Amino acid sequence: MKGMIMLISCLMLIDVVVESKNGYIIEPKGCKYSCFWGSSTWCNRECKFKKGSSGYCAWPACWCYGLPDNVKIFDYYNNKCGK
């Protein structure tokens, strides 16, 4: 029983440590990184530069997977692009 509790505790800790987010990466002014069909290689490179696991061009902007919590992503409700 103690072993089972320890296993569950470890799994919960791993989930907290490896938690990541997905979303559109943004430029310093708050706008999404623009892309065109066929530029998924560029988006993937940009996402990995920001410590994400991968990314692709979800036209018209780069979508990233596995971003760390400190990386800002586009938020529709707090959009600062062009303001």
UniProtKB/Swiss-Prot annotation:
One of its GO terms (biological process) is defense response to bacterium. Keywords: Amidation, Antibiotic, Antimicrobial, Disulfide bond, Ion channel impairing toxin, Neurotoxin, Secreted, Signal, Toxin, Voltage-gated sodium channel impairing toxin. Disulfide bonds join C31-C81, C35-C57, C43-C62, C47-C64. It is found in: Secreted. One of its GO terms (molecular function) is toxin activity. Residues 21-82 form the LCN-type CS-alpha/beta domain. The modification Cysteine amide is found at C81. GO terms for cellular component: extracellular region. Its main location: secreted. Pfam families: Toxin_3. SUPFAM superfamilies: Scorpion toxin-like. InterPro entries: LCN-type_CS_alpha_beta_dom, Scorpion_toxin-like, Scorpion_toxin-like_sf, Scorpion_toxinL, Scorpion_toxinL/defensin. SMART domains: Knot1. Expressed by the venom gland. It comes from the Eukaryota. Belongs to the long (4 C-C) scorpion toxin superfamily. Sodium channel inhibitor family. Beta subfamily. Inhibits the sodium (Nav) currents in an apparent irreversible manner. Produces small depolarization and induces repetitive firing in squid axons. Is specific for arthropods (crickets, triatomides, crabs and squids), but is non-toxic to mice. Shows antibacterial activity against both Gram-positive and Gram-negative bacteria. Has the structural arrangement of an alpha-helix connected to antiparallel beta-sheets by disulfide bonds (CS-alpha/beta). This is Ardiscretin. It comes from Tityus discrepans (Venezuelan scorpion).
